[in-house]
């Protein structure tokens, strides 16, 4: 991407980390696009982070490696960074800055859109509703994803979140309607092998035809990670609000995004906040997460599933902590379940979807969905208590009902949580398994479900 025109300056005062400080600047604007010309004639893009006292601090997307103060020029082009968009972006693969990575020509643009997006008027926001089927029972059954929601996945280093992300991207759909559905997948700071896995997974399954894939690799400049989720969401907003599609945006790994933000903050010598992250981390994350939603009078929707790895599996770390304040629930992957070979290792007791009630029930999934979900959650919680008790007194000290709850816990992990990476379960199959699980209990223990549903769906003998 090159840009023409603008005002050129050759007085580069300093190069510090990913930043270039330009002297003698007049009439520059915050977030303005800047083209850096190197000694060898190469060009790199950047944007203005700060202006004042005749100086401009420019963040260079491709990094400053190889740049020198002498011979480097900066051209301020008078506009912000924009992403060219059209229906032709579907089925395409781009790098973290939105440039084609699949050896195909640039898609013909219908329009160019500011990557920072337009703020959604709160009065024009429509409440998220309607079910998105991921084909993953743990999510569909107990922490349902709703159109327009932002539901993060909290994972840990080395766990199976990338496999789960790819499975959701392949399988997700809106059921019972003829509405168009698309997936925008942004991989942020991932290894080459992970990027190839995402690409092959979408291509071989045929899901790439309805998807847009952005790949920012670990060896790309960290600064590029700040741009990747924004170009991805710009495409998603165009598909949703201009073309009327329901769009699922998967962002992985947002921890790499936050690390890049910390790197830039340190280079600017800003006063650090918790664990060295900038004090505006919450505000910055909200500019990404709040781009999910639905608008009154618009057919489409943007739903987000951001994925982040919790450093040291610490859910109180600033990144998951602040993410939880902005988003509407969380899906937490458990290390213990992962070690036991459960996939996906969803810890349902630490997970929830705050908007689940608005996307399920009669006319959306099934009339008993909420109650059987509550019953499974309650039974699993009781099973965990019984397991802890058995660790102290042994199985011989347990009552018959305790043993049945322990069996329900095992069944839930082995049948409801565990599924193959290519297994796409319908909501009917998921609800059937949930009834199979609690049918290991006597009817009088099913206190979260109405009697009429017990009579209709219960599969036990008593």
Swiss-Prot record:
What is any one GO biological process for this UniProt entry? proton motive force-driven plasma membrane ATP synthesis
| Molecular function terms from GO | ATP binding; proton-transporting ATP synthase activity, rotational mechanism; proton-transporting ATPase activity, rotational mechanism
Read off the InterPro entries from this record: ATP-synt_VA_C, ATPase_a/bsu_AS, ATPase_F1/V1/A1_a/bsu_N, ATPase_F1/V1/A1_a/bsu_N_sf, ATPase_F1/V1/A1_a/bsu_nucl-bd, P-loop_NTPase, V-ATPase_su_B/beta
Q: Does the keyword Membrane apply?
A: yes
Give the GO cellular component terms, alphabetically: plasma membrane
Compartments in which it is found: Cell membrane
UniProt superkingdom = Archaea
Q: Which SUPFAM superfamilies match?
A: N-terminal domain of alpha and beta subunits of F1 ATP synthase, P-loop containing nucleoside triphosphate hydrolases
**Its function?**
Component of the A-type ATP synthase that produces ATP from ADP in the presence of a proton gradient across the membrane. The B chain is a regulatory subunit.
UniProt xrefs under NCBIfam families: PRK04196.1 (NF003235)
This protein's assembly is summarised as: Has multiple subunits with at least A(3), B(3), C, D, E, F, H, I and proteolipid K(x).
Protein name per Swiss-Prot or TrEMBL: A-type ATP synthase subunit B
Organism field? Cenarchaeum symbiosum (strain A)
Q: Which gene encodes it?
A: atpB
